[in-house]
């Protein structure tokens, strides 16, 4: 298992394994700041372009224009498609990994910030941002299957074993995080728990039963079926980038520019692997 890290000032870096040293990856992108990885390739997003690379050797496959206000990237499990979420055009785009050609596009929300694919790669879930909605679309065609209405702006969403998990910014005395679940066949989301602070990132754990959620108050692990928190790391507040592989997690912290590698079962087992400015990291699992 390797790590790849993009930093807007320091470029792209790779660690050969969990404890290995970092080596710089040649990358011509201006201000790279997003990464995602799949079974055969990795995609790095910058201000104007995205670059697709092979997982082994990190050789260039293709270049493609970055969606305006690029907010998120993900790769299909088969490696054929790259999905780009645009926070300025309020849309999601499907491009071919091999050529960068734009083949599908669909509107999603207002200033959307997050999206993810299910395990099969056939459904894409997009959080609608400032719109009180989330959207379930087919992949790669981006045909809308369902619009999910939430009671407040939806900033992150994911697939768990019991359906969908939706993370929203709710208003009260202060803005806080409201987490909802939506079971298959049910008409509306059910509130699971309120968390302090505005919402950051979300990652569903590999077992499909837990979730890492970052808010202004820290990085937390949620037991979804029971609706209770298992732990909280206050020094990892507002992590925009979260990803898991097996028992390990990578947290890209927005406030302090750190990339932290930790066990999501034993969060005290952690270390900082990189410090930068605008950072985003993911696992290379191929």
Question: Language model features by range: what are they?
Answer:
Residues 1-286:
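Predominantly soluble domains enriched in secretory-pathway, periplasmic, or organellar proteins
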């Amino acid at each position: 298992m390797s790590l790849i890290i993009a930093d807007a000032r320091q470029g792209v870096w790779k660690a050969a394994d969990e404890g290995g040293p970092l080596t710089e990856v040649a990358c011509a992108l201006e201000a790279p700041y997003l990464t995602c990885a799949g079974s055969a390739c990795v995609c790095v997003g910058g201000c104007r372009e995205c670059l697709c690379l092979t997982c082994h050797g990190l050789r260039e496959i293709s270049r493609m224009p970055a969606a305006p206000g690029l907010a998120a990237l993900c790769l299909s499990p088969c490696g054929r498609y790259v999905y780009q979420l645009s926070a300025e055009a309020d849309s999601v785009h499907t491009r071919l990994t091999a050529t960068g050609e734009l083949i599908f596009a669909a509107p999603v929300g207002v200033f959307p910030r997050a999206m993810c694919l299910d395990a099969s790669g056939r459904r894409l879930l997009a959080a609608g941002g400032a719109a009180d909605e989330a959207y379930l679309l087919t992949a790669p065609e981006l045909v809308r299957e369902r619009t999910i209405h939430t009671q407040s702006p939806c900033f992150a969403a994911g697939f768990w074993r019991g359906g969908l998990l939706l993370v929203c910014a709710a208003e009260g005395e202060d803005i806080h995080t409201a987490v909802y679940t939506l079971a298959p066949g049910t008409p509306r989301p059910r509130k699971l728990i309120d968390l302090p602070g505005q919402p950051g990132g979300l990652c569903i754990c590999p077992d499909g039963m837990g979730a890492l959620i970052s808010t202004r108050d820290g990085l937390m692990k949620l037991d979804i079926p029971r609706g209770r928190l298992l732990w909280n790391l206050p020094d990892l507040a507002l992590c925009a980038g979260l990803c898991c592989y097996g028992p390990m997690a990578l947290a890209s912290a927005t406030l302090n520019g750190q990339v932290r590698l930790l066990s999501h079962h034993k969060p005290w087992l952690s270390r900082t692997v990189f410090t930068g400015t605008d950072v985003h990291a993911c696992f290379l699992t191929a």
